[in-house]
Amino acid sequence: GMVDTLMLSSVSDQAVGAVGTANTYIGVFIIMFGVISSGMVAVMSQNIGAGKPGIAYQARQLGLVFNALTGILISVVLAVFSGGILRAVSIAPALLESAETYLKIVGGASFLNALIPIFSSYLRVFGYTKHSLIGTVVGNVINIILNSVFLFVFNWGVMGVAAATVFSKVVNLIIVAAMGAVLIKAKQSPERAQPRKILAQIVKIGFPSAFETALYNVAMTFIVCFMNHMDTDGMNVTARSYAMQIANFSYCVGAALAQANAIMTGWRIGAKKYEECDRGTRKAVIYGLVTATCFSVTFAMTGRFIVQDRKSTRLNSSHL
């Protein structure tokens, strides 16, 4: 998202606003993926800590099937009804065409957003965190290259950025899926449990976490809807898009620490090392708070250098 925002900012601020708006509504629709993904990580890590990698593999398979089916359904909905969704939330007329193009292409491939976390989490819970990172880095590098070609050579604008995003996600998915198949041999472990029992555990753990995310995304949806009514050129939504992408850097620090701590906590719970869970979580909170604060202060002071339009610059600085 940050790459797309920075590269589109050289084309027009309205393109940034259109993509930011489309991504907001894509985020609302893919909340259901989080129910399985977050619950699956907890179940897998606990069983790995308990010495039952075979059950962890079962949890991965269940998560894969559920998210694949849900992802295909959501992809069809977003591809077919993208224009209707944007008109229903009264998107600024100046942003409608670009936002619809992006939502149709990237939203139509949202099943990739459902599958990538399954395979990436599978690598992480077994300790292959660097390998998961490789897939992400390669995908981002390809995204940057294709964005450059589509934007500055073919002049495809938002459509080019959307196509580059989808292709980079396909590459990311192939890499993490292949690495998981080669590096992890949990399938060969004899431990097995009732699939219904495992799925119940996944949903029980994942639903509260996904519901928390859902409330946040719904709030963001209403905010974007209100901002769309504030002007006809979409400048307020554009400023928000810049601010959110910049602020995501500090968010990523907390998210990374949270993911690492969740996996390690699962290992310790499985191994019945409960006191270590508390100590590890306290350390993660302190590290995350200090680092995120440093990022937040830095971006609040430097955010005005990214935006071209003066009005958008003032709005962006106030958002940050």
Describe every region a protein language model picked out.
Residues 16-76, 113-132, 224, 237-303:
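Small-residue-rich hydrophobic transmembrane alpha-helices
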Residues 315-320:
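Single conserved hydrophobic/aromatic residue that forms the stacking wall/gate
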Residues 165, 174-216:
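Interhelical loop/hinge segments that connect adjacent transmembrane helices in multipass membrane
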Residues 27, 67, 106, 132, ...:
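Residue-level signature of transmembrane alpha-helical cores of multipass secondary-active transporters
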Residues 2-17, 86-93, 149-156, 214-245, ...:
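Helix-terminus/linker motif at the lipid-water interface of multi-pass membrane proteins
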